[in-house]
């Protein structure tokens, strides 16, 4: 089973991954692999300190204080290790339930697999076209951290809000 979505009534942009990696499942939260660049990148984009790897509340705070939401495209699947290429038996998450609770205006997919799954299973339900962003996974090491910050920052610039919490 996937993790619960992180969102509030102030979440206007949804960031979607594919499925939690083994390290994320071990940590019981999104992007738990120590080499994943997601949390350092989001901290840089929001002006927040980089949260400690095990500080789930600080990570949730980065998302919630800045008008974002975080979830995965899949509720369940069969996967070998952390290889997105091995994903089969997919069950997509119920995006309609999230959209009924949060005023999501934009969807951003963390990597090509999340984008492909979103487009196939979730776009017909949401009606919101997604933006495919380069994966923050350590498997995408060819994409430098500076490039990730630049591309993600440009995509999210109109959606990252100033904290009022």
Residue ranges and their predicted role:
Residues 12-13, 106:
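Structural motif
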Residues 23-86:
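Short, surface-exposed acidic-centric catalytic microdomains
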Residues 50-51, 116, 122:
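Short polar/charged helix/loop
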Residues 106, 112-115, 124-129:
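Catalytic phosphate/metal-binding cores of nucleic-acid and nucleotide-processing enzymes, i.e., regions
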């Amino acid at each position: 089973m996937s993790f619960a979505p992180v969102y509030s009534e102030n979440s206007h942009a949804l960031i979607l991954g594919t499925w939690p990696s083994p390290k994320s499942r071990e940590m019981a939260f999104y992007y738990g692999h120590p080499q994943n660049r997601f949390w350092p990148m989001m901290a840089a984009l929001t002006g927040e300190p980089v949260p400690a790897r095990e500080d789930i509340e600080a990570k949730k705070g980065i998302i919630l204080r800045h008008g974002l939401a975080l979830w995965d495209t899949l509720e369940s699947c069969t996967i070998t290790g952390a290889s997105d290429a091995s994903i089969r038996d997919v069950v997509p998450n119920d995006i309609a339930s999230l959209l009924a609770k949060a005023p999501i205006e934009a969807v951003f997919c963390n990597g090509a697999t999340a984008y492909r799954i979103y487009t196939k299973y979730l776009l017909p339900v949401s009606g919101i076209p997604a933006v495919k962003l380069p994966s923050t996974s350590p498997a995408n090491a060819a994409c430098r951290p500076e490039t990730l910050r630049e591309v993600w920052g440009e995509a999210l610039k109109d959606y990252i809000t100033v904290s009022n919490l």
